[in-house]
Design a protein with these regions (language model features):
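Membrane-water interface regions at transmembrane-helix termini and the short interhelical loops
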Residues: 66-70, 74, 134-156, 222-225, ...
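Selective recognition of specific alpha-helical transmembrane segments in multi-pass small-molecule
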Residues: 51, 55, 59-60, 159-171, ...
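A generic transmembrane alpha-helix motif of multi-pass inner-membrane proteins
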Residues: 174, 185, 193, 376, ...
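Hydrophobic alpha-helical segments and their helix-loop junctions in multi-pass secondary transporters
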Residues: 97, 101, 161-188, 206-207, ...
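TM-loop-TM module centered on a large, flexible mid-protein loop between adjacent transmembrane helices
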Residues: 71-77, 249-299, 351
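Membrane-interface loop-to-helix entry segments
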Residues: 142-171, 349-361, 380-390
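Hydrophobic, membrane-embedded alpha-helices of multi-pass small-molecule transporters
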Residues: 13-23, 93, 170-177, 186-253, ...
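Hydrophobic, small-residue-rich membrane helices and short re-entrant helix-turn-helix hairpins
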Residues: 144-155, 193-196, 216-245, 263-275, ...
Length: 454
């Protein structure tokens, strides 16, 4: 009997679905700003950024398929049932009301409303009003899921991508400066690869891939593929197609960002940079189109995230707190957070991402190599414990200086700097994870087979 697999056309459809899930307007602000910071070192910056903003997210989706899991909670549950619940909650809150949803509102405001205000001195008030209207729409459609998100996805997203392509081509044909002539900022002068690797965390796509991988699997199943191995293969191949498109967009965005330094000073954030570039090359009309399309794209993303988070928490709590209640709670919290502003949200998210990404990357890696140790729980535990401990030091290091002083973190940070290789590159968790894996494998191989399978 022949195992059904996706056709090329179907793989392209799945790749398009995955691209729509991953790539929102917020993803554009990081590569453009990265290009401005990296300058002539744009190529190593591209490589580092693509690894964490494309490679790991694609493999995160594939990890759900390869392990035949029915979602993130099942995959993380290979460590323990409690860990599966904890990690699922943490990831959904991060890509939901803590950072990603509020960021959607502030990206829309920064690219759409803020440029028209000038130095009014009342930007906080306009942000408050804008975010109130934005989240009123988000809540309305989250409580009444219907064709609005499909309409935005089928019409607004293609318009946005076409507009973005026109903008990038215009910028490439008339660059403000050659990227090779742009001086990098201090952090990117001697080593652009490692800072860019960490910059890719900001997209949050690796943890989003873990959270939404099951959605892609369901799409493939609805296309008639039922064999688990075939599903895993189709997830990976479709993901690679998505990754190629995302990588192309990131490469162009980073290059245009670097070239824009010939026209503008280093911007406060990527939203400001994108608005400046659109205004320079396409005028006021270009800025307006950018603002409208990004706002609708961010609206769609926010509705999807509120819906996904509310459904997940409704399921995990057994309906004790209704979907409607979760949707209202997450929307209200996102509204409150959005009013700290885009730059603040990005800055506040860094320590949390430094804490979450290492165990997420470790989980994805273990999912891929798990067949070599039968997905023995002891190996997962042996890797996760040192990874979390080491990631905690990265979390401490990236906290604001005032928080470090208040919490008396100088001593533990200095300890980590002296004892963890690559700590200065924000990868101090890597060696502990490898050592933990080695210990776990030794433990696994020394145990009776029936114990390892337990």
């Amino acid at each position: 009997m022949t195992t059904k697999k996706l056709t090329i056309r179907q793989k392209l459809l799945v790749a398009g679905t995955l691209f729509g899930m991953f790539f929102g307007a917020g993803n554009l602000i990081f590569p453009v700003h990265l290009g401005q910071m990296a300058g002539r070192n744009a190529i190593p910056a591209m490589i580092g950024f693509i690894i964490t903003a494309v490679g790991i997210p694609v493999f995160g989706v594939a990890a759900i398929g390869i392990t035949h899991s029915d979602g993130l909670q099942t995959l993380a549950g290979k460590v323990s049932k409690g860990y599966g619940i904890f990690f699922t909650c943490l990831l959904y809150l991060t890509i939901g009301p803590l950072f990603a949803i509020p960021r959607c509102a502030t990206v829309s405001f920064t690219t759409g409303v803020a440029p028209m205000l000038g130095d009014s001195g009342a930007e906080w008030l306009y942000l408050l009003i804008f975010s109130a209207v934005f989240f009123a729409f988000v809540l309305f459609f989250s409580l009444r899921p219907g064709k609005i998100t499909v309409w935005i996805g089928k019409i607004i997203n293609p318009i946005f991508l076409i507009f973005f392509a026109v903008l990038m081509i215009a910028a490439l044909l008339a660059p403000g400066a050659a990227a090779s002539a742009v001086e990098p900022v201090a952090a990117y002068q001697s080593d652009a690869f490692f800072p860019s690797l960490i910059e890719g965390y900001g997209t949050m796509d690796a943890i989003a891939g873990l959270a939404f991988g099951i959605v892609v699997i369901d799409v493939i199943r609805r296309m008639g593929v039922t064999n688990d191995d075939a599903i895993a293969e189709d997830v990976l191949s479709s993901g690679l197609l998505t990754g190629l498109l995302m990588a192309l967009i990131y490469v162009v965005s980073i290059l245009v960002g670097a070239q824009s330094r010939g026209l503008f000073e280093l911007s406060e954030n990527g939203g400001v940079a994108l608005t400046q570039i659109a205004g320079h090359y396409l005028g006021g009309v270009g800025q307006l189109i950018l603002a409208v399309t990004i706002t609708f794209a961010c609206l769609k993303t926010s509705i999807g995230l509120v819906t996904a988070c509310a459904e997940t928490f409704d399921k995990m709590t057994g309906g004790k707190f209704s979907y409607r209640g979760w949707a209202i709670l997450f929307t209200a919290f996102s509204f409150a957070v959005s009013n700290v502003g885009l730059s603040a949200i990005i800055n506040y998210s860094i320590p949390v991402l430094m804490l979450i990404y290492p165990p997420a990357i470790a989980l994805i890696t273990l999912a891929f190599i798990g067949r070599f140790f039968g997905h023995d729980r002891i190996v997962y535990i042996a890797v996760m414990i040192p990874t979390w401990i080491a990631a905690l030091f990265d979390f401490m290091k990236t906290l604001p200086g005032s928080a470090q002083t208040t919490l008396h973190l100088d001593a533990p940070i200095q300890f980590a700097a002296a004892n963890l290789p690559l700590f200065d590159k924000n990868l101090g968790w890597l060696l502990p994870a490898v050592i933990g894996f080695a210990i776990g494998m030794i433990w696994h191989l020394s145990r009776p087979k029936n114990a390892a399978a337990a």
